Amino acid sequence: MENTENSVDSKSIKNLEPKIIHGSESMDSGISLDNSYKMDYPEMGLCIIINNKNFHKSTGMTSRSGTDVDAANLRETFRNLKYEVRNKNDLTREEIVELMRDVSKEDHSKRSSFVCVLLSHGEEGIIFGTNGPVDLKKITNFFRGDRCRELTGKPKLFIIQACRGTELDCGIETD
């Protein structure tokens, strides 16, 4: 065998000490050493799209125009990515929590990932059901590794399209 800079033979590695790489305690067990996820399960995953457009009068919130177009585009995009897509419209805060609890208890063993898209009004750290606010932590906590074991080590994406308060966001300029 030619001895080049990029080649290794068994003699050169016999006396090497094994190198142990410790992950952080918060790291899901399915992440490989190169920080990538295993995405070869039989199904790509489940995508839940919650589209809140119309709000109860008691909230004082206006209807969200354009949100149906966003929801349709997201549905098409995730279907093209081979996700099972479920659209839910105008859910109360209680219905959002119940839906997330139920979805977290589903059989995800054959799925590579999970996506939740929330289209609604919001503020910093919260999203609005049609009748009031829900803490985002309450929603995402259902999918923690200790509560939703079948998604441990798999990507869980939460996409939130909502205002985060009343302060002006100057945005960023791109090329």
Question: What kind of region is each of these model predictions?
Answer:
Residues 45, 153-155:
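Short glycine-/polar-rich loops that comprise or flank the Walker A/P-loop
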Residues 81-85, 104-111, 124, 147-151, ...:
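Eukaryotic basic, amphipathic alpha-helical target segments in cytosolic regions
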Residues 48, 115-119, 157-159:
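Structural motif
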Residues 59-65, 90, 100-101, 128-132, ...:
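Short coil/turn segments at secondary-structure boundaries
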Residues 1-115:
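Boundary/activation segment at the start of structured domains
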Residues 52-55, 90-93, 120-124, 132-134, ...:
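Conserved beta-strand elements of beta-rich interaction domains across eukaryotes
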Residues 154, 162-163:
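Eukaryotic endomembrane system proteins
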Residues 119-152, 169-174:
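A short, glycine/acidic-enriched catalytic loop
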